[in-house]
């Protein structure tokens, strides 16, 4: 009976991280707004506090009765780079969840990307790629759409566009 319940239960979460940038300058992007010397004073303390809050938000989505079960899959929008995703999955409260992730490398001038974080126990990634969004003439480039497909624990294939 328990195994049937586990097979039919899959938690999917989407979270806008609202500019999750690290504190290091990327010379290929316009990320100057999120540096310790900027008007925002984006310090390591503020960065790690944001990582902590996001990880708590994700964990709260998996709470079931008095137990905490991490969501099986989380789409994260407005993340800067692989370094930020590494910190979130390996150096935050989520480190014990064992999440894997894939992400885009979009042409957005500030470096804003989309990531898909997933539990390898609930989702086996088969394929992922970015779908480029061509902006209308006169508009600046935007983030790509992330497409991922994989097999869920029931054996079905799940297609995700984020």
Regions found by a protein language model. Give the residues of each.
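N-terminal, active-site-proximal structural segment of metallo-dependent hydrolase catalytic domains
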Residues: 8-112
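Structured beta-strand-rich core segments of catalytic domains in phosphoester-bond hydrolases
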Residues: 79-161
């Amino acid at each position: 009976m328990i195994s049937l319940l586990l097979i039919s239960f899959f938690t999917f979460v989407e979270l806008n991280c609202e500019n999750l940038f690290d504190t290091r300058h990327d010379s290929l992007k316009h990320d100057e707004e999120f540096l310790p010397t900027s008007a925002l004073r984006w310090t390591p303390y503020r960065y790690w506090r944001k990582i902590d809050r996001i990880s708590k938000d994700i964990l709260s989505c998996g709470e079931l009765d008095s137990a905490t079960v991490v969501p099986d899959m989380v789409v994260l929008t407005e993340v800067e780079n692989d370094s930020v995703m590494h910190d979130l999955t390996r150096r935050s409260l989520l480190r014990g969840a064992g999440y894997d992730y894939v992400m885009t490398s979009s042409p957005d001038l500030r470096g804003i990307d989309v990531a898909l974080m997933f539990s390898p126990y609930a989702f086996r990634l088969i394929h992922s790629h970015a779908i480029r969004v061509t902006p209308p003439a006169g508009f600046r480039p935007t983030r790509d759409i992330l497409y991922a497909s994989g097999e869920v624990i029931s054996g079905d294939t799940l297609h995700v566009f984020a």
